[in-house]
Structure formats: structure tokens, C-alpha cells
């Protein structure tokens, strides 16, 4: 198996002293699996796509945030009008006496440590900081180098204050419409999602919410739910021994035949063939061995 492409710091950071850079992806195209000599913060502003991080697939859209370590490997697939910012930084070049280890997860080896969502308010606060950071990181004077680190710290604090786990949006004091619906969908991977009931409980207008969701993500609510269910199915196919019919049920598909048809259409292969890709073949002994 070929090693992933390595992205080098010198190709993205203006000098060996500059700690931070911003790469705008307007839009983000399909990008092969790669790793880095630096760390990244990825913030998604619009559109959607499939982000595969350390072999874990995520259907990403507006408000998703990833903290990516240098040794992580990831790729972008099936992108549709995907707009995001990559904030690149080298931890060894940061000199401010800040609690970076608390501000920039992942904090441990657990899966999904690097995946968060950002509130609408947090996105509004982060955007101008990133714009200024992009400007300063293109300069080489000592003051700009120091200012980029200050701006990175400011951004890290804003993200810390306004990030949340997708399944915990209901704990936010003032849940925005998009935050609430994203949380509800994440909790409906294996169960029926009643849109009318959700809107009634949260005092939302269904038609307006559907329009807002499509405007921000580039897809309908039902399509997004189907996509994140398929991502969950891929994880189970790769990392569990559950029967395909059980996986279908765990991912909200009552009919395993329908699940297989949808999966095949989206992935270009059957669930069984997809699973086979991640099963290691046994090493056969040489012919002269007993």
C-alpha cells in the first residue's frame, strides 16, 4: 500500500520563522489522501463533501470544524460547492505562553477527538480573525510574525468558546436553528426522524428551516441524513463484524435490500465488496515451506 502524499511546511509557510498560514479553499476540490509536516484547523463555511480522516468518513458541511495533527492522514471526496479555510500552524514555532494543549485538541487518542461543530455566532466571530490572519501571514517582518501567533491564539479561544459536539447541541444556551437540526440528525442515525415533530418542539417553521438548511449546506435535510447514515455504515463495515442486515438497521434502514441498493449507488460498490477492501488477506507460506 502506497504511503500518503506528504505536504511540506516550506510549501505553505512564508518563512522558517512564520508559525501560521491560511489557505482558502473556495472551493475545495477532491484531494487525495495526504499527511503533513504541520497541524491544521479546518473550518467549513458552505457546501458539502466527504472528509475521510484517519480512515473515518465524515459527511461535512457548514459549521464543521476539524483539528488535524501532523501525523493524521485525510482526503476529500465527493465534494459539492465545498468552501472551507485551512489554518496551518507549526506548534514548535509558537512562543506565546498560552495553554495551547487545552485550546487545540485532540486531547487524547479517542476517535472523533478532532471533530467538532461551531455555532453560528462562533462562525461570525471567527471569520474576520481568519481574514486578518491570512493578511498578516503573507508578510515577513517580525511584527507580523508575532501578530499571526496572537491572532491564532484569539481564534483558538473563539473556537474553544463556541465549539460543541454534534450530539450535544441541545445543551447550548441559545441553540441556533442550524445547530439544533444538526444535533437532532446526528442523534437519528438509527431511528426515524420526524421533521414536523422536531419543528413543533422547537417552535420552528418547517419550510423556513428547510430553505435555510439547503442554503447553508447545498443539500436537503433528508439527503444529508441519508449521507451521514451511509458514513456511519461505512465505519461499521470497516470496523465491526456485524451482519450487513444488522448494520442496515443500525443506520436507519428497515429494508436491508434497499440499504444495499442505496449504498451501491453512492459508494460504487456493494456493502460486501466495500467491507472486503478492509479485510487483510492471510499471508500464504512459500511453496518450499512445510
Swiss-Prot record:
SUPFAM superfamilies: Homeodomain-like (SSF46689), RmlC-like cupins (SSF51182)
Record gene name: rhaR
Main location group: cytoplasm
Domain HTH araC/xylS-type: residue ranges: 179-277
Keywords from the UniProt entry: Activator, Cytoplasm, DNA-binding, Repeat, Rhamnose metabolism, Transcription, Transcription regulation
Cellular component GO terms, alphabetical: cytoplasm
Marked site: Interaction with sigma-70: 246
Compartments where found: Cytoplasm
GO biological process: positive regulation of DNA-templated transcription; rhamnose metabolic process
Binding region for DNA: 196-217, 244-267
Subunit field text: Binds DNA as a dimer.
Listed name of the protein: HTH-type transcriptional activator RhaR
PROSITE patterns documented for this protein: HTH_ARAC_FAMILY_1 (PS00041), HTH_ARAC_FAMILY_2 (PS01124)
MF annotations from Gene Ontology: DNA-binding transcription factor activity; sequence-specific DNA binding
The protein's role, per its UniProt record: Activates expression of the rhaSR operon in response to L-rhamnose.
NCBIfam families reported in the protein's UniProt record: PRK13501.1 (NF010026)
Amino acid at each position: 500500500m502506497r504511503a500518503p502524499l506528504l505536504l511540506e511546511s516550506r510549501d505553505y509557510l512564508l518563512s522558517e520563522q512564520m508559525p501560521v498560514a491560511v489557505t482558502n479553499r473556495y472551493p475545495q476540490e477532491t484531494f487525495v489522501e495526504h499527511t503533513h509536516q504541520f497541524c491544521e484547523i479546518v473550518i467549513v463555511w458552505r457546501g458539502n463533501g466527504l472528509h475521510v480522516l484517519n480512515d473515518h468518513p465524515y459527511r461535512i458541511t457548514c459549521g464543521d470544524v476539524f483539528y488535524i495533527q501532523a501525523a493524521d492522514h485525510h482526503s476529500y471526496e465527493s465534494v459539492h460547492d465545498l468552501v472551507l479555510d485551512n489554518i496551518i500552524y507549526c506548534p514548535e514555532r509558537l512562543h506565546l505562553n498560552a495553554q495551547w494543549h487545552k485550546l487545540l485538541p485532540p486531547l487524547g487518542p479517542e476517535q472523533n477527538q478532532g471533530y467538532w461543530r461551531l455555532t453560528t455566532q462562533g462562525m461570525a466571530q471567527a471569520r474576520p480573525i481568519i481574514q486578518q490572519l491570512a493578511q498578516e501571514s503573507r508578510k515577513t517582518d517580525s511584527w507580523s510574525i508575532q501578530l499571526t501567533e496572537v491572532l491564532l491564539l484569539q481564534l483558538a479561544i473563539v473556537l474553544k468558546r463556541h465549539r460543541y459536539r454534534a450530539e450535544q447541541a441541545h445543551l447550548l444556551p441559545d441553540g441556533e436553528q442550524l445547530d439544533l437540526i444538526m444535533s437532532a440528525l446526528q442523534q437519528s442515525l438509527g431511528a426515524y426522524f420526524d421533521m414536523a415533530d422536531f419543528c413543533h418542539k422547537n417552535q420552528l417553521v418547517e419550510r423556513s428551516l428547510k430553505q435555510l438548511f439547503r442554503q447553508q449546506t447545498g443539500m436537503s435535510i433528508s439527503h444529508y441524513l441519508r449521507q451521514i447514515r451511509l458514513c456511519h455504515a461505512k465505519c461499521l463495515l470497516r470496523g465491526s463484524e456485524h451482519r450487513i442486515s444488522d448494520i442496515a438497521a443500525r443506520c436507519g434502514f428497515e429494508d436491508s435490500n434497499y440499504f444495499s441498493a442505496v449504498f451501491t449507488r453512492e459508494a460504487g460498490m456493494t456493502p460486501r465488496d466495500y467491507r472486503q477492501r478492509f479485510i487483510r488477506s492471510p499471508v500464504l507460506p512459500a511453496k518450499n515451506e512445510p
